Amino acid sequence: MSRVSQARNLGKYFLLIDNMLVVLGFFVVFPLISIRFVDQMGWAAVMVGIALGLRQFIQQGLGIFGGAIADRFGAKPMIVTGMLMRAAGFATMGIAHEPWLLWFSCLLSGLGGTLFDPPRSALVVKLIRPQQRCRFFSLLMMQDSAGAVIGALLGSWLLQYDFRLVCATGAVLFVLCAAFNAWLLPAWKLSTVRTPVREGMTRVMRDKRFVTYVLTLAGYYMLAVQVMLMLPIMVNDVAGAPSAVKWMYAIEACLSLTLLYPIARWSEKHFRLEHRLMAGLLIMSLSMMPVGMVSGLQQLFTLICLFYIGSIIAEPARETLSALLADARARGSYMGFSRLGLAIGGAIGYIGGGWLFDLGKSAHQPELPWMMLGIIGIFTFLALGWQFSQKRATRRLLERDA
């Protein structure tokens, strides 16, 4: 086996272990933020939405800067520093009793993510061959789902005792992850050339095809981020107990572990990437619309199942498209900018979703935020369809990934 092949094989295992630690650390804390501050402390949902939206916007919106710096200096220092900042953010969150302190903790957490997320994504593109990426992204999503359930179960159990224990556990996991990267991650370059920070950013901004694709996905992310805000609140309201939230993540894990990889393998042989992305988005949008009208937990979990199935179809295709469009000369910059849609959509989804949720509750129209999200998803579906229908874009970008 050549040294390059050996590095790729070892790199796959490293990426999987690293991803599991990151997912566990994240999901121990973040799914419970809305329960802690809205349900237990009585804050308005929009206050928590601002905190979550701030973290999302900082982490993803500044991702191009983190990616460009990683292109220049390498992945390792950025990843280790970012994970330690995330740990500091979680530690601060544990003592948050005022909105400004929660916002500050989410700011720290987001800045940490800005540093470690783009180089981690670029490492996947660097180490995984193009024809294997869709399947590897599917494996990562399966791992994400399993880690989300384990993390949410652990966090829910710890929340019975003290929210500070929840945050401390998340912080410790990110410190361990930082140590793991500091010890084992080689000093790999992310790009084929050592691209100056400004040049990498300029290269991305001039790529209008990539910029259009990324910005269009903002609507997709407005729906996707509700698994952290409105869906847990809705499950808690219908069930009458925060412990039911863990079953929402258990559903995601069961569906992902049983369906994600088979669907990815089958669909890559029969459908283009853009068709899979659009089909998943349409299912997500339609499943959102009736959520505010259900009164039973069984009905709610059925709609959540449909939402997750849509995500299972769409997410590997979205990740693979982003990697396919990235210029090898500035991988970090491209993967950083690819998060801008998540930054915009996530911030609007969290803040706007929290505001609409409060508005719908006060106006006795609980279906309002869910119908609006469904409409946004359908408009995004139409926008993607228009974008991918352009002959030039289709010919240049969207080959089958099999």
From Swiss-Prot:
Compartment(s) where it occurs, according to its Swiss-Prot or TrEMBL record: Cell inner membrane
Residue stretches in coiled coil: none
PANTHER family: MULTIDRUG RESISTANCE PROTEIN MDTH, RESISTANCE PROTEIN MDTM, PUTATIVE-RELATED-RELATED
Topological domain ranges for the Periplasmic compartment: 34-98, 160-164, 235-243, 298-299, 361-367
Gene Ontology, cellular component aspect: plasma membrane
Protein name: Multidrug resistance protein MdtH
Similarity comment: family membership: Belongs to the major facilitator superfamily. DHA1 family. MdtH (TC 2.A.1.2.21) subfamily.
Main location group: membrane
Gene Ontology MF, one: transmembrane transporter activity
Membrane topology of this protein: Multi-pass membrane protein
InterPro entries on file: MFS (IPR011701), MFS_dom (IPR020846), MFS_trans_sf (IPR036259), MFS_Transporters (IPR050171), Multidrug-R_MdtH (IPR022855)
Annotated keywords: Cell inner membrane, Cell membrane, Membrane, Transmembrane, Transmembrane helix, Transport
Transmembrane segments: 13-33, 99-116, 139-159, 165-185, 214-234, 244-264, 277-297, 300-320, 340-360, 368-388
Cytoplasmic side: 1-12, 117-138, 186-213, 265-276, 321-339, 389-402
